[in-house]
């Protein structure tokens, strides 16, 4: 059992969802909480979608986030059924598309601030799309409608093992962060997304693409002072049973523990 004091605090991004009875909930899927707790060995802390409370006052929001990041050792950006509102990258939304304005207004500025402060960042599915948009890139809103692209959406099965089953291989960029972590140039991943990277953000580096159609599957940020890895697939699903997923969570965990140790050093000196 890992002692609580040695577990890094990992902020987990939440969505804002209507509960069907006129109320609203800040929600995080259990699989992300379990991944932060068990696969990354951390203590998960929910980051509520509070961006709208600050309106257009981004400096005030970032001041609030600074207080949060001062206490966090890592940030995990979760997947979601909702999509980033396309006005953030100069496009219009299609009727019927599910969005989460509160999450967008929280995560997009938080991503830039987290990266620039060197706080370890691990982004999954929607999280990858958020990283690309936050840093100036754009998205395909419907990858399956792009000529030459496969359908990256999952089956709609009541059996989650079917939905999260291996779907296609990815080609891992030579010499990149992902190859360094996995020691391989090709692995098989699941696929549960309708949107995907269109124009790559200037600061981002492609770490992997789908072998079948070239769609971006992983990103890093080479000029970031800390760990940044964004994945289009879902390594959190039954992560403890998947060696590839565990290598990725191990790397994130190591970065989080290093930040925990660095944060603890000044406090120990102050106590002497």
Question: Where are the regions a protein language model picked out?
Answer:
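Glycine-rich beta-to-alpha active-site loop
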Residues: 123, 128
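Active-site-proximal beta-strand elements of phosphoester/diester hydrolases
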Residues: 229-232
């Amino acid at each position: 059992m890992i002692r609580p004091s040695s577990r890094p605090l990992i902020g987990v991004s939440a969505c804002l969802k209507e509960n069907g009875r006129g109320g609203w909930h800040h929600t995080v899927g259990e699989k992300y909480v379990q991944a932060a707790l068990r696969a990354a060995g951390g203590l998960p802390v929910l980051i509520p979608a509070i961006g709208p409370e600050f309106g257009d006052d981004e400096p005030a929001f970032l001041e609030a986030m600074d207080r949060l990041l001062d206490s966090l050792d890592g940030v995990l950006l979760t997947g979601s059924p909702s999509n980033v509102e396309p006005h953030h990258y100069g496009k219009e939304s299609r009727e019927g598309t599910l969005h989460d304005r509160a999450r967008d207004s929280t995560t997009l500025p938080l991503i830039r601030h987290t990266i620039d402060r060197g706080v370890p960042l691990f982004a999954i599915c929607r999280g990858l799309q958020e990283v690309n948009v936050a840093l100036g890139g754009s998205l395909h809103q419907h990858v399956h409608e792009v000529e030459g692209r496969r359908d990256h959406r999952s089956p709609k099965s009541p059996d989650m093992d079917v939905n999260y089953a291996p779907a296609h291989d990815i080609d891992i960029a030579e010499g990149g962060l992902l190859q360094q972590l996995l020691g391989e140039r090709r692995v098989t991943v699941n696929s549960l997304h309708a949107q995907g990277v269109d124009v790559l953000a200037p600061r981002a580096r492609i770490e992997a693409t789908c072998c079948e159609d070239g769609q971006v599957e992983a990103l890093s940020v080479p000029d970031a002072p800390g760990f940044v890895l964004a994945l289009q697939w879902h390594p959190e699903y039954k992560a403890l049973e998947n060696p590839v997923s565990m290598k990725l969570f191990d790397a994130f965990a190591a970065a989080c523990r290093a930040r925990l140790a660095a944060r603890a050093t000044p406090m120990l000196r102050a106590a002497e």
